[in-house]
Amino acid sequence: PRAVRDSEGAGGDRDASGEICDFEEYSWLYHESWRDPDVRWLLSTVPSCMILDDHDLRDDWNSSYAWRREMTAQPWWRDRVIGAFASYFVYQHLGNLAPDELEDNSVYQALRAADSDAERERILSDFAVAADSERGASQWSFKRDFGRVRVVMLDVRASRHLDPADRRVMDSDEWEWTRRACLDADVDHLLIGSSLPAFMLPALHHVEGWNEVVARDRPDKPLTAQVGEWIRLTVDLEHWAAFRNSFDDLVGLLTEVAAGTGAARTDAAGTDVATRRGTPPASILLLGGDVHCSYLEEVELTSPQVADSPTRVHQLVMSPFRNPLQKSIRAVNRLSVRGPVPTLMRRLARAAGVREPAVRWRMACGVRVDNGGMG
């Protein structure tokens, strides 16, 4: 598109001249990525479900209110949104849905009923624009049950709430869906998938919490906020720990699941009341990616509510096919796990007013930077 070509030389994230944009170019990228023999073998032998992250649309997508305000003002943004969401819907999201969910999916049914390619293109374009600009127009999160195992896959990109005073990786509707999907599960094992790790390497976790406070847009400290925003985008501080309200909500949800608390139901008076689901699951496994390396963590929930819970909690962060990780970042990862750095970063976060979480975690295996699974 001309708007993309004209962005050359605009500077910073405004220059999209060397990037893909429309549906056709995204289709080429899927073809190029998935034709690799190793990728084809993996997808043909291992059942898969998928969830979008920033590079499905653009690097740093929805990292902050300031980022979104600048990007949505660019003349090429609409074409980018259409290409990204339309291709993701076709190539990835439809494969996440069960047959009954496909029957109930209005966009899918409209595409099947369309008489021409032009009509299908219009349907996908309208859907993509609405998915980006209208709350509730789409839901990318989904759940799957495999016997006594439930997988809950979370969209932590498209549904973000970016108000600087109350940043969250999900808006209230998406979070309520997440709670019900986890608390309604009468299962032995609960898997919660998120493109972003919930529990970062310790020092990085504390840095993200500190940065969120510093980058908060406040009239009394505009320069501090600008510097904090620059750090956030430069170092990619955009995981759960950088959205502390959501991180605390997640820890609270894990605690409820481990305690055997069921989802809220409405009584005859219209009041939400908690129900008991009974025996909590034997395990909760959080799945994450994004960070170009792999590691396994043991997670300990510290609330008295789960003092006697049998539920074991782990997080597995994995990149079966990962992008290269510079030696400098590998060194940062090593420093983030042991020695004085995590302690110093924790003190920095506490000095900024970041709350102590009701959870602890430790590295059980990793950090690995090679391709493949964790054994």
Question: Where would I find each of the regions flagged by the language model?
Answer:
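Metal-dependent phosphoester/phosphodiester hydrolase catalytic core
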Residues: P1-G375
